[in-house]
Amino acid sequence: MWTQRNAVGNWLLVLTAVIGFLTFIWIPQTSAECQTRSIYCYECDSWTDARCKDPFNYTALPRDQPPLMTCNGCCVKMVRHQRSPYEVVRRMCTSQLQINLFMVDHVCMMESSGNGHMCFCEEDMCNSSKNLHTNGCQLHLIAIAVAVSWLMGQLLSR
């Protein structure tokens, strides 16, 4: 028998499904590739420039920091041989890499051995950070996914 409670539950279920679907369609499109505006990224390699090493001295005078380059993509920070005497840090712009950004999704990727990582970010000088974090779109997606899961659980428990 069709009741008002079933109608409201079904309406909420449909609304939740639509919001969830739109979120998974919209969010990847907004964050799938690096922004088109120019940003500044540090460009250095700790193998040849000690200023590039971690921890990065972002409070140093500009002349005592590695060079900044204009970037029409994302800033990148790569670390090899992490936490060892042979650690190498490289900071650059994605325009210097041949990589499919749709696969990267602006996160940190660990090297298969676990001894290194590559991180992407989209703000001026963001590749100076020791630990790069996920961008706002990813946090937004996680929050919506949690809300959708909670709503689905509430509806299915009736």
UniProtKB/Swiss-Prot annotation:
Where does it reside? Cell membrane; Membrane raft
Transmembrane keyword on record = yes
Function of the protein: Bifunctional regulator of neuronal activity in the mushroom body, and possibly other regions of the brain, that acts as a signaling molecule required for homeostatic regulation of sleep under normal conditions and after sleep deprivation. Reduces neuronal excitability by enhancing Sh/shaker K(+) channel activity; possibly by stabilizing Sh/shaker to increase protein levels, accelerating its activation kinetics, slowing C-type inactivation and enhancing recovery from inactivation. Specifically affects the A-type K(+) current.
Protein name, as recorded: UPAR/Ly6 domain-containing protein qvr
Taxonomic classification = Eukaryota, Metazoa, Ecdysozoa, Arthropoda, Hexapoda
Q: List the disulfide bonds.
A: C41-C75, C44-C52, C71-C93, C108-C119, C121-C126
Residue segments, region Loop 1: 54-67
> Which residues form the lipid moiety-binding region (GPI-anchor amidated asparagine)?
N127
Q: How is it modified after translation?
A: N-glycosylated probably on Asn-57.
Keywords from the UniProt entry: Biological rhythms, Cell membrane, Disulfide bond, Glycoprotein, GPI-anchor, Lipoprotein, Membrane, Signal, Transmembrane, Transmembrane helix
- Glycosylated positions are N57
Chain segments annotated as transmembrane: 136-156
> How is the subunit organization of this protein annotated in UniProt?
Interacts (via loop 2 of the three-fingered Ly-6 domain) with Sh/shaker; this interaction may stabilize both components of the complex and may be required for targeting or retention of Sh/shaker to neural cell projections. Interacts (via loop 2 of the three-fingered Ly-6 domain) with nAChRalpha3 and potentially other nicotinic acetylcholine receptors; this interaction is required for antagonism of nicotinic acetylcholine receptors.
Where does this protein come from, organism-wise? Drosophila yakuba (Fruit fly)
**Domain remarks in the entry?**
Consists of a single Ly-6 domain, adopting a three finger fold stabilized by 5 disulfide bonds. The first loop contains a region essential for protein folding or that is required for localization to the cell surface. The second loop mediates protein-protein interactions.
Q: Which family does it belong to?
A: Belongs to the quiver family.
Q: Where is this region: Loop 2?
A: 77-91
> What are the boundaries of the signal sequence?
1-32
Recorded hits in InterPro entries, A to Z, give: QVR-like, Sleep_regulator
GO BP annotations listed: negative regulation of membrane potential; positive regulation of circadian sleep/wake cycle, sleep; regulation of circadian sleep/wake cycle, sleep; regulation of synaptic transmission, cholinergic; rhythmic process; sleep
Listed under GO cellular component are: external side of plasma membrane; membrane raft; plasma membrane
Summary of the tissues where the protein is detected: Expressed in mushroom body (at protein level); overlaps with expression of Sh/shaker and nicotinic acetylcholine receptor (nAChR) components also involved in sleep regulation. Expressed in the adult brain and head. Enriched in the mushroom body, anterior optic tubercle, superior protocerebrum, antennal nerve and visual projection neuron fibers projecting into the lobula plate of the optic lobe.
Q: Could you tell me the membrane topology recorded for this protein?
A: Lipid-anchor; GPI-anchor
Pro-peptide positions on chain:
128-158
